[in-house]
């Protein structure tokens, strides 16, 4: 489904919280949304790697990488695995790499930027805890919507308004 965040903001002003503008769109899906699954990790993408192996239909992984720009939390292999397992998208408060392949992958991907270095794999990270960045708290089970206009969060699923 295609989401237009300005239209969602207009239709549901009391429900949505808008994330501060900071993300770039990298995936082949420029618009995506779904139920939030959270990962909190810092320069270690072990939990991200575990999660992309899980079924992700109707879900968006939101990764709090602490805003680090010293290593990439997502690369082409993990992005392709996430797409194959049905994830709608991944939003990373951190960096990604392999952007030329990710741009061709059927997945929504937003991140702060790119970095060619991979992370260490120390097995450190938290799954499905509340995380906060960009002035918004992301709660597992709530919903996130993203497009080229920005990222918004809602405690319940939103439908695109009908054109008048």
Curated annotation (Swiss-Prot):
InterPro entries: RraA (IPR010203), RraA/RraA-like (IPR005493), RraA/RraA-like_sf (IPR036704). Keywords: Lyase, Metal-binding. The keyword Acyltransferase does not apply. Pfam families: RraA-like. It comes from the Bacteria. Its EC number is 4.1.3.17, 4.1.1.112. A divalent metal cation binds at residue 98. Signal peptide: none annotated. Divalent metal cation. CDD domains: RraA_family (cd16841). Its cofactor is a divalent metal cation. It catalyses: 4-hydroxy-4-methyl-2-oxoglutarate = 2 pyruvate; oxaloacetate + H(+) = pyruvate + CO2. SUPFAM superfamilies: RraA-like. Substrate binds at residues 75-78, 97. The keyword Kinase does not apply. One of its GO terms (molecular function) is metal ion binding. Homotrimer. Catalyzes the aldol cleavage of 4-hydroxy-4-methyl-2-oxoglutarate (HMG) into 2 molecules of pyruvate. Also contains a secondary oxaloacetate (OAA) decarboxylase activity due to the common pyruvate enolate transition state formed following C-C bond cleavage in the retro-aldol and decarboxylation reactions. Belongs to the class II aldolase/RraA-like family. This is Putative 4-hydroxy-4-methyl-2-oxoglutarate aldolase. It comes from Hahella chejuensis (strain KCTC 2396).
